[in-house]
């Protein structure tokens, strides 16, 4: 059983049940999932291994009194984080004590409903930092490698929206340092299969451990494209008890890959969920373009699933080329019947700071306050052009039906038209005289 990248993929009890049933679990060992999948225990493991972590609480925060003490010690702003799960669920930023009680209650409730555990802890909320993660791969023979980094700073409410590899600011030396820390964490936990070690990176190139995702990531295709390594295939090899087919020396990053998560959300209405039926669908294609989607004409988008409905991934030799290719692919992506966040992605790609690689985890908040909504989406402009064209055709057809051309062109001077007479020319002259 391969669990994909949903919440079951991180559920150690489910993994153990699969194994106990005599089936092959294509994923990390349940023991490693329990150690690293829980953010608090992963934090302890990282600290024991000497990995720098974000300042925070080392125990769960259960009630308001504990929350006040922890927040006072760490210093505002603080980030309340669910110990289980991921995907931005059970997380709240608190900037003052007056916000603490409501945020704690909401985070605990959301964590409980999402992951079956309401355990939360506190971290210092670091601002003006990047979110950079390292893809790791390990086998059961004690070999682990890293496949480079992904830049994941473009996110909203702690949910990633755009990912790319390599990061615009990570050079070979920093990649090696972050990669070695990620590999050490995997080996210390006797990890096997695919996983992701997430870090915060500050402007001085200091990095801090965040958490480990003990599963395949949504954004794994960007790493596959720049490394040429099929991560899922390696997962199958590891699940069969085979060693990795690659070594660290085999891994080279080539070109640049970008992924945009396409969601059924209306960016013009505060990203409200958009429900409905897919009326028409036109997916982009061509060299270096990949679409992961289950959309089809007539398909329903309901409230019962995550709003992400597709992933659009591109690869090109350079980041600049990849940005151009992604923009073209987004402009060609036609989804009718529901609203999507494609206009948002187009706006980000047109942003100068983003194009220059200047971003942090607060990018989207700033971007949304800059009036980007005043710029028309390419889809809107396309519809306007099409409507204008069709309108002109309708008007011309009415004129034809009304006898403006009437079979033979009618002479303007009452005389018969010459053999050089043109119905289009006559119609044009009549239009000019109206």
Predicted regions and their residues:
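N-terminal beta-alpha lobe that positions the nucleotide/phosphoryl donor
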Residues: 2-197, 201-217
């Amino acid at each position: 059983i391969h669990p994909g990248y949903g919440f079951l993929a991180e559920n150690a009890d489910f993994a153990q049940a699969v194994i106990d049933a005599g089936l092959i679990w294509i994923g990390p060992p349940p023991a490693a999932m329990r150690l690293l999948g829980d953010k608090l225990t992963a934090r302890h493991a990282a600290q024991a291994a000497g990995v720098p972590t974000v300042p925070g609480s080392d125990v769960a925060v259960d009630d308001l009194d504990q929350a006040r003490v922890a927040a006072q010690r760490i210093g505002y702003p603080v980030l309340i984080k669910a110990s289980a799960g991921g995907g931005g669920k059970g997380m709240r930023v608190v900037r003052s004590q007056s916000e603490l009680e409501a945020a704690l209650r909401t985070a605990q409730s959301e964590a409980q409903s999402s992951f079956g555990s309401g355990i939360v802890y506190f971290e210092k909320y670091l601002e003006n930092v990047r979110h950079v993660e390292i893809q790791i791969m390990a086998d059961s023979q004690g070999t682990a490698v890293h496949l480079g980094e992904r830049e994941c700073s473009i996110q909203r409410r702690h949910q990633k929206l755009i990912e790319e590899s390599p990061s615009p600011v990570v050079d070979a030396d920093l990649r090696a340092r972050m990669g070695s820390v990620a590999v050490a964490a995997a080996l210390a936990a006797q990890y096997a299969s695919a996983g992701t070690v997430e870090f915060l990176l500050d402007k001085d190139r200091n990095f801090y451990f965040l958490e480990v995702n003990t599963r395949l990531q949504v954004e794994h295709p960007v790493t596959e494209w720049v490394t040429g390594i099929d991560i899922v295939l390696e997962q199958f090899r590891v699940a069969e008890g085979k060693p990795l087919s690659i070594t660290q020396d085999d891994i080279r990053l080539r070109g640049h890959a970008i992924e945009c998560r396409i969601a059924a959300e209306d960016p013009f209405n505060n990203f409200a969920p958009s429900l409905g039926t897919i009326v028409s669908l036109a997916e982009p294609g061509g060299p270096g373009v990949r679409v992961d989607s289950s959309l089809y004409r007539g398909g329903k988008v309901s409230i019962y699933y995550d709003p992400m409905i597709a992933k659009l991934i591109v690869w090109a030799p350079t980041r600049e080329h990849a940005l151009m290719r992604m923009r073209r692919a987004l402009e060609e992506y036609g989804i009718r019947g529901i609203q999507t966040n494609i206009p948002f992605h187009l706006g980000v790609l047109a942003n100068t700071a983003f194009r220059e690689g200047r971003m942090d985890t607060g990018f989207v908040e700033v971007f949304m306050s800059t009036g980007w909504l005043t710029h028309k989406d390419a889809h809107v402009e396309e519809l306007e052009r099409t409507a204008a064209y069709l309108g002109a055709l309708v008007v011309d057809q009415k004129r034809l039906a009304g006898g403006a051309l009437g079979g033979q062109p009618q002479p303007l001077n009452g005389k018969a038209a010459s053999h050089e007479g043109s119905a289009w020319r006559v119609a044009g002259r009549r239009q000019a005289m109206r």
